[in-house]
């Protein structure tokens, strides 16, 4: 098993990194690093004899977080990022209707459950009060999570 990334190499996180309970001072499930964030490899080690874990320093937040190899790409690799990601809290920007009946009001809060990049652009599956709807990116806005 050889590491894919070298010391001091700049890398990008391809998915949100949330606390699995191993980072003190953060609740389990708390957002630690947003996908698309960049950082630098400080060290690496092996977990369960079959996974390389990289110690990544994220200068923007001055955090050092452990990331699995499959969660990282080289900074030189093209990055196609959507605006939102799984579990993001959002607010609906306009009323959404099904067969003329409003089912989601403007301002209603929801949570992203899935993302999709199609020919018509980004769309998201959002849970609004227990009902899931596929909505275009223009219909929702991110509610920023407070990172502690």
UniProtKB/Swiss-Prot annotation:
InterPro entries: Nitrogenase_MoFe_mat_NifZ
Family per record: Belongs to the NifZ family.
Organismal lineage: Bacteria, Pseudomonadati, Pseudomonadota, Gammaproteobacteria, Enterobacterales
Coiled coil start-end: none
Keyword Isomerase: no
Name of the molecule in the record: Protein NifZ
Alphabetic keyword roster: Nitrogen fixation
Species of provenance: Klebsiella pneumoniae
Example GO BP: nitrogen fixation
Name of the gene: nifZ
Pfam families per record: NifZ
Keyword Protein biosynthesis: no
A single GO molecular function term of this UniProt record: nitrogenase activity
């Amino acid at each position: 098993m050889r590491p894919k990334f070298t010391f001091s190499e700049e890398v990008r996180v391809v998915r949100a990194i949330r606390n699995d309970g191993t980072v003190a001072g953060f609740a389990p499930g708390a957002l630690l690093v947003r996908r698309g964030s960049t950082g630098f490899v400080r060290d690496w080690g092996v977990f369960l004899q079959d996974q390389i874990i990289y110690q990544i320093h994220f200068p923007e937040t001055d955090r050092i977080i452990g990331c699995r190899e499959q969660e990282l790409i080289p900074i030189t690799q093209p990055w196609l990022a959507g605006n939102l990601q799984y579990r993001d809290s959002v607010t609906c920007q306009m009323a959404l209707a099904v067969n003329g009946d409003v089912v989601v009001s403007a301002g209603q809060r929801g949570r992203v459950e899935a993302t999709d990049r199609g020919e018509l652009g980004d769309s998201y599956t959002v849970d609004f009060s227990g009902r899931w709807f596929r909505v275009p990116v223009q219909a929702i806005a991110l509610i920023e999570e407070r990172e502690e």
